[in-house]
């Protein structure tokens, strides 16, 4: 029996490929407004601090291709063909959809490399893909909206947290708190009924319960540079407050809203949060990110197949 041919659209935020890309990338994030020279320099300095341009583009490719290969290995009905679509740099989401159309793909499934749904992120990615497909015609896209509660994904983090706690001394474990975080978004999303904060709270609860961790807190990180208020508390402020008010001496950070080693994790956690823990004399731990680890790729494949099953 001939396999059905299907597009696999993997969408992500995107990252500069080289230093010369930083300005146009940042300009795209700012909706066409060029950043002030000091803002641009600040971003360049952050990339320098993590050892140069973020590894995110390579990791995204490994995740997307790994997912496609794994999907083709674990079932025999569909032959998946992968396309990467990025939000803020080429190949843009629209480019990926146009390529699928050009290759004669009439059916596709899409997934965003962000576990929680929000109108700001996942909804906008899916809309861009859908709008382009509608414009081109004869291409139907089934979109995954969120996958934070996929048991295999939760298990990935449970295992990482357990391993991290097992690596600590008894003294560190006794004074430890788990901080589960995601990318902050403008507070106005709450008034609009966005499920994003609730989904993060559910993630934190599932991971903490699964790993048998009693003391855990929810934080937000990497907020944008705009006058609007953003969701808080910020992870750095939260770290200080927890130290001062509850006396924790060991901080374990799980940035569950992200899936790879990139600027928000390597700088905002490993540098900025560590500055705080060093300042207060506390221990800093951050379990490994999923990147393209087989357990994570398998979790994503399960999500995709479940979605296709649901939409039959």
UniProtKB/Swiss-Prot annotation:
Its main location: cytoplasm. Pathway: Porphyrin-containing compound metabolism; protoheme biosynthesis. GO terms for biological process: heme biosynthetic process. Fe-coproporphyrin III binds at residues 13, 30, 46-47, 54, 125. The keyword Ligase does not apply. GO terms for cellular component: cytoplasm. Its EC number is 4.99.1.9. Keywords: Cytoplasm, Heme biosynthesis, Iron, Lyase, Metal-binding, Porphyrin biosynthesis. Disulfide bonds: none annotated. Fe(2+) binds at residues 183, 264. It catalyses: Fe-coproporphyrin III + 2 H(+) = coproporphyrin III + Fe(2+). Belongs to the ferrochelatase family. This is Coproporphyrin III ferrochelatase. The lineage of its organism: Bacteria, Bacillati, Bacillota, Bacilli, Bacillales.
